[in-house]
Amino acid sequence: MTNFIIITAANDKYFWLLQKFIASIRDHDAGREAPIGVLDLDLSSENIAWLEAHGARVCDPGWDYKMAKAEDNWFKAMTARPNLPKHFPGHDIYLWLDCDTWVQDWGAVELYLEGAARDGFAVTPEVDRSYDYEGFYDFQYSCYKTGFGRKMAKKLASAPIINCGAFAATADAPHWDIWSEIFGACLAKKVYFWAEQTALNVAFHTRGLEASFL
């Protein structure tokens, strides 16, 4: 069996979602003993005890970057994401899923793990022929312009969004360091909500990174 860990993050406000997320994993035969890591974004001692009783490892990641302005602890879910192997060492593959995810079909987990094992990184672009893209360009342009300037925004705003709410990567994938480098440079100048996902997209679209796109 692949040595993997599923990682997410939450604070007390979103703990009820985190509980359902963990239940959706444990409900599958393959997920009953699956390692789970939780980034502590201000969890009470009672909630941490519940997580540990359900087999989860809890980690306060601290701040991984020097930032242009201070943020509340919930922002650690963003700053820790390119650094998961550092916070939960000892695994071959790291699968990140936002805590509002529900694992309905374990086959989806396997697709991410298999994609990462094969190509180093597995992730899903937000693209489909049935999507309505009205307003999409303006949103993307704003994300790129805020963190990376007009030139980058013009170059990448029409590209599909690579969603970092669900991805898997091997511990030694080059993507981690490249993503972290780009994200850190962004945060030194501008801190904003979509910065970590925008940095990942810049990494893919400008550094020639390969992945299994699901």
What are these regions (language model features)?
Residues 1-214:
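Glycosyltransferase catalytic domains, chiefly GT-A lineage
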